[in-house]
Amino acid sequence: MENISYMDRTLPVGKSFDLIKRTIEIGERKAVLYFIDGFVKDEAMLKLMDSFMGVTKEAMPKEAEMFSQRHVPYIEVDVLKDFDQVLRNVLSGVTCLFIEGYAACIAIDTRTYPARSVEEPDKDKSLRGSRDGFVETIVFNTALMRRRIRDEHLIMEMTEAGQTSRTDIVICYMSDRVDKELLANVKSRIESLHIDDLKMNQQTLAEAMFKRKWFNPFPKFKFTERPDTAVACLLEGKVIILVDNSPSAMILPTSILDMIEEANDYYFPTVTGMYLKVSRAIITILTVFMTPVYLLFMMNPSWIPSMFEFTAVRDVINVPLVLQFLILELCIDGLRLAALNTPSMLSTPLSVIAGLVLGEFAV
């Protein structure tokens, strides 16, 4: 069989231990299965083998399409005639069946993926929201989004990037809400990529799609590990990009205001959510400018405005009680936000550093 000979020459059968070639007989015809060990469901393969062993010579149809319809008891089945597609499917974990006398290949998607359970992300926690998060398996991530939007306008287009890795990429959007010009721009940028592989998954894709200028520190994408946040952005007309082997979604377009938003802002009443947004914006600004401004005022005390004179190192000054409460409330909110968004692996070293800094300041 020419097809089997070509597959044996192209694939490293016998060299790669996980690349399996299984020769069987179906209806008194020679047949060969190609698949990757570790990707195949054993139960599904047993059912397929039982079905194949029961096919008689008289029951063999003339074409591969008819055989797939009559004798392949599985849902995801395709008939391929292009060898590039066959090789790509085999290396992706799909089981490919060649039968003597058929010019086409029968691709049976019996894949199963090693994946961790769905759990809440460490750095994007919510007080009142759902407790699920994206994982490294792309089909699980699309299912989490489909569960929340049961609408025919939700489109998920599959493509790939990387000449060697051939990493799966899914472009998600609402066809009745998305900006068509933005969508066309995103598709053209992904299709025009000429890279060997996505070493760092989404970060590599982001850098390849939009070349960042050195003088612009702001990101082009917003990343989230929460399906509810991604779905909310879809309903706003934005585009979501999912990359296989990455537990987060890329959101675009984005702005500076999107970076300070969190899921908690929408799980509380409007007034509370607005307060959280304003507090986060103030804390973000203070994080960037408070240290240099404080140093500037300490070196030039005459520049301190009258309303902030209590910050200067002088004798005892009575700070207005209302101002004390406002500063205390803002500090508590800042600590709460830091506790919610700090990964568990960084919480201990940051606590030690904070204790040393506060102790040195007190002394």
List PLM regions with ranges.
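Membrane-embedded alpha-helical signal segments
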Residues: 1-289, 297, 303-304
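Transmembrane alpha-helical segments that form the functional core of multipass membrane systems
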Residues: 255-363
